[in-house]
A protein has these predicted regions:
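Portal/gating segments that form or line small-molecule/metal binding sites
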Residues: 53-107, 119-121, 193-196
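Short, acidic/turn-prone active-site loops that include or flank metal/cofactor-
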Residues: 27-28, 44-45, 68-70, 87-91, ...
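Binuclear metal-ion centers of metallo-dependent hydrolases, dominated by the metallo-beta-lactamase
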Residues: 5-6, 77-92, 143, 166, ...
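Metallo-beta-lactamase
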Residues: 122-175, 179-188
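Active-site metal-binding motif and surrounding structural segment of the metallo-beta-lactamase
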Residues: 26-72, 146-151
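Core dinuclear metal-dependent hydrolase active-site scaffold
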Residues: 1-33, 84-146, 160, 210
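Short, Asp-centered acidic motifs that coordinate Mg2+ and/or phosphate
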Residues: 20-21, 37, 149, 176
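Divalent metal-coordination and catalytic microenvironments
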Residues: 15, 42, 49, 99, ...
Length: 210
């Protein structure tokens, strides 16, 4: 399930399966310019980075973005026909890839307000459902997620900490859980280790971050 899936840093994820997909490209080390689809969860600099998008975009790359980012992409000069704006809690399909948006927001801090309608994504590839949570706390919406693989923030401060993330994973019970959002801006490598330690034995915790 995790073949050809990388956590490049922070919450920057690359999936190379039927298509090459980036989620929140950030601190990309060189020009790859190979993205079929780029998913953006919200507009904070460590998730929406135009500098890093330029390193992965190619002719015809499809953007999946929250509505509020549309103006920024158009000002940057990206083709409107290549952009799909999404709402939280909806299902979509692009380039043969099915995906669903899950609201991503804070419940006890002010960094990611619910009313902004920022999102995480459940992306289905070859029948496997990958949940990329975005910047979120435990919410009523993500407690109902059904997925096979979950990539969730564990670093705290702006999102769930490792204890909260483990509690969410133990509730939704994916087969595999991968920690993100630690070790670069907030959170430590120990947070990832402690997250895995707290998982139910039936759930496989794996660190993918380089």
């Amino acid at each position: 399930m995790l073949d050809n899936i990388e956590v490049l840093c922070h919450s920057s994820i690359r999936i190379n399966k039927e298509k090459i997909i980036y989620i929140d490209p950030f601190k990309i080390d060189k020009n790859y310019n190979d993205a079929d689809v780029i998913f953006i969860t919200h507009d904070h600099y460590d998730h929406y980075s135009e500098e890093d998008i330029d390193k992965v975009i190619k002719e015809g790359t499809t953007f999946i973005i929250p509505e509020e980012l549309l103006t920024k992409l158009l000002v940057k000069g990206y083709n409107k026909n290549d952009i799909i704006t999404v709402e939280a809690g909806k299902q979509y399909i692009t380039q043969g890839i099915k995906f669903k948006t899950i609201p991503a927001y804070n419940t006890n801090k002010a960094f990611h307000p619910k009313e902004n309608e920022w999102v995480g994504y459940i992306i289905e590839i070859k029948g496997i459902r990958y949940y990329i949570a975005g910047d979120t706390d435990i919410t009523e919406e993500n407690k109902k997620v059904k997925c096979d693989v979950a990539l969730v923030p564990v670093g705290g401060t702006y999102t769930m900490d490792f204890k909260e993330a483990a509690r969410l994973i133990n509730e939704i019970k994916p087969q595999i859980a991968v920690p993100t959002h630690y070790g670069d801006i907030v959170g430590t490598n120990q947070d990832a280790t402690d997250f895995i330690r707290l998982l139910h034995p039936i759930i496989k915790g794996i660190i993918l971050k380089k």
